[in-house]
């Protein structure tokens, strides 16, 4: 059964019967009536409350079978009810997803992207949530006090994420020197084809898992080759993988990205630090462009007027917060693909990040990795992430490389780094310029 057919069947099963529609969404007509009763007083209001209570009781009466503990990510529809999407099914929409009533969503203030563990029983539509056990690992009552992500105060990244792991892994050592990453960074890896971006992403994820065990690592793969998805799942068993391969529909690409970002937001609200890798924001923008085209006006490269609105919003979710956690997003942007659309996407998004790691195809063609253009790579406000003495010595290195061609600069940088067991030891050996 295709994803599209499954999704349509779910929507039909939730709305085709009038009795079902009244139970799930209280009916279009009764919703309007209840809205009027809320505004008024007297008998109308009590009648509306009585009707709602009767419908809530109907849910309980129709349940049968033993209570079973299940869990998944909550996805709320525009009509107020929701479903738990299961990790084992790659968060796809299926007919046996756990149904969450509008009353439970309202009473507990549930939001998209929450990881919910609950007791369920069989209802006439399938499994239905009957009792919340925990929300994002917390007691359901504690969750009610959580702030909203949009209300959190965003500040500059000021806590560095150390990426260096071993002496011979030059990828992460070079990033620590040239484009350091902090908690809440919004970074772009600007990558031509076959320049080593997938390897860099994998090394970054492994570094965070090894060096920062308290940080939740998430990987979002959009319109990716199926074998790449399988390889990353195998290589990163401790990361949460959200993937849509290129044999899936466009709507699935958009949907899985929104689920992943909402999941990350809910973790930040709970005070956790999240590190997300996104591959790629270019393909995500293409997906939203195709999903929302519908014959509307197009601009340069075939992009519709509002095609980049949602990708920009998702990428902009990366931030360091003052009173809660942080969301770091490192996304890849594809360039030199002979596509006017890809070039336009990069031009529109490059100003939204605060860190860039630029890969160079001419360096990669010489089999020099990581194929980084040192002069075009860097982090804004890196002085907030580095101790003053390290920042000064890294500035000395950059000045020493100035005037070289990019391929000469990376060769010289790597040859120096190979002589020392760590970056710290290398920086100690550099004499300050007084």
Regions found by a protein language model. Give the residues of each.
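Charged, low-complexity terminal tails
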Residues: 1-67, 73-75, 80-81, 88-96, ...
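Short, charged beta-turn/beta-strand-edge "cap" motif at the junction between a beta-strand
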Residues: 104, 120-125, 194
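Short, structured beta-strand/loop micro-motifs enriched in basic residues and often containing a Trp
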Residues: 93-102, 165-171
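Short nucleic-acid-contacting surface segments enriched for D/E, G, S/T with interspersed K/R
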Residues: 104-117
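P-loop NTPase catalytic core
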Residues: 187, 195-196, 204-208, 212-434
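P-loop NTP-binding catalytic core
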Residues: 122-189
């Amino acid at each position: 059964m295709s994803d599209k057919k499954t999704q349509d069947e779910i929507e039909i099963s939730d709305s085709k019967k009038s009795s079902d529609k009244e139970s799930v969404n209280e009916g279009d007509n009764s919703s309007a009536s209840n809205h009027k009763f809320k505004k008024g007083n007297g008998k109308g209001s009590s009648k509306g409350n009585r009707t709602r209570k009767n419908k809530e009781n109907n849910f309980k009466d129709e349940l049968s079978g033993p209570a079973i503990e299940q869990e998944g990510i909550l996805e709320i529809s525009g009509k107020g009810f929701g479903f738990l999407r299961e990790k084992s099914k790659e968060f796809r929409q299926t007919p046996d997803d756990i149904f969450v009533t509008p009353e439970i969503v309202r009473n507990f203030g549930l939001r998209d992207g929450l990881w919910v563990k609950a007791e369920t029983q069989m209802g006439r539509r399938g499994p239905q949530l009957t009792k919340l056990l925990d929300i994002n690992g917390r007691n359901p009552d504690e969750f009610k006090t959580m702030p909203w992500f949009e209300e959190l105060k965003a500040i500059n990244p000021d806590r560095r994420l150390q990426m260096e792991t071993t002496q011979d892994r030059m990828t992460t050592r070079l990033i620590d020197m040239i484009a350091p990453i902090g908690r809440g960074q919004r970074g772009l890896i600007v990558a031509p084809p076959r320049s080593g971006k997938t390897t860099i992403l994998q090394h970054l994820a492994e570094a965070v898992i090894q060096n920062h065990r308290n940080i939740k690592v998430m990987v979002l793969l959009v319109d990716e080759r199926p074998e790449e998805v399988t390889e990353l799942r195998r290589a990163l068993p401790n990361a949460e993988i959200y993937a849509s391969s290129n044999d899936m529909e466009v709507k699935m690409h958009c949907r899985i990205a929104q689920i992943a970002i909402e999941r990350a937001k809910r973790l930040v609200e709970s005070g956790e630090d999240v590190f997300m890798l996104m591959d790629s924001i270019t393909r995500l923008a293409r997906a939203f462009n195709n999903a929302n085209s519908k014959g509307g006006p197009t601009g340069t490269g075939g992009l519709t007027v509002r095609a980049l609105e949602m990708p920009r919003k998702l990428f902009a979710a990366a931030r360091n917060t003052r009173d809660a956690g942080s969301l770091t997003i490192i996304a890849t942007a594809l360039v030199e693909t002979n596509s006017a659309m890809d070039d336009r996407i990069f031009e529109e998004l490059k100003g939204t990040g605060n860190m860039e790691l630029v890969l160079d195809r001419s360096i990669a063609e010489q089999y020099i990795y990581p194929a980084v253009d040192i002069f075009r790579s860097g982090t804004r406000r890196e002085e907030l992430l580095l101790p003053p003495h390290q920042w000064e010595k890294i500035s000395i290195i950059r000045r020493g490389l100035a005037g070289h061609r990019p391929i000469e600069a990376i060769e010289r940088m790597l040859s120096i780094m190979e002589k020392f067991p760590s970056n710290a030891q290398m920086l100690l050996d550099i004499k300050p310029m007084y």
